[in-house]
């Protein structure tokens, strides 16, 4: 019986490791979403919508839900409201994916630039497309 236990030890360790990683991933996501809530003031239904959108983006893009939440944090710091974040996150994520840049950094760049140009969150998708084209055509990257 002792031999059987020794044979299962690597399997048990692997399963425990997966469980630990899943708990950490969930905790990271919750931590990021708490920051979004604190900065944006989103509660109740607004917060639930943001949380669902971050999870959706994590499921359908190369980025995780935690990374999407981190991008929303920068949007919240820029004063974006819930509807702005819900509508703007896809354009920012597409730009980050196309450019290979970090998602949170890309969100920071887009929100800062929109503010500097006096544009609104509604312009984020178009603005992200322009940045992607400019960086591609100018042999540079989005952060330069």
Task: Explain the meaning of each model-derived region.
Residues 1, 7-59, 70-78, 85-99, ...:
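Small-residue helix-packing and pore-constriction motifs in hydrophobic alpha-helices
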Residues 61-64:
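N-terminal glycine-rich anion-binding loops that anchor highly charged ligand groups
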């Amino acid at each position: 019986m002792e031999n059987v236990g020794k044979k299962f030890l690597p399997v048990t360790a692997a399963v425990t490791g997966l469980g630990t990683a899943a708990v950490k991933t969930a905790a990271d996501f919750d931590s990021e979403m708490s920051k979004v809530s604190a900065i944006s003031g989103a509660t109740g239904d607004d917060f639930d919508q943001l949380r669902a959108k971050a999870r959706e983006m994590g499921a359908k893009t190369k980025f995780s839900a935690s990374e999407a939440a981190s991008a929303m944090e920068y949007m919240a710091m820029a004063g974006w409201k819930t509807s702005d974040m819900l509508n703007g996150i896809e354009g920012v994520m597409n730009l980050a994916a196309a450019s290979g840049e970090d998602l949170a950094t890309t969100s920071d760049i887009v929100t800062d630039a929109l503010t500097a140009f006096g544009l609104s969150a509604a312009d984020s998708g178009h603005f992200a497309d322009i940045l992607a084209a400019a960086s591609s055509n100018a042999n540079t990257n989005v952060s330069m």
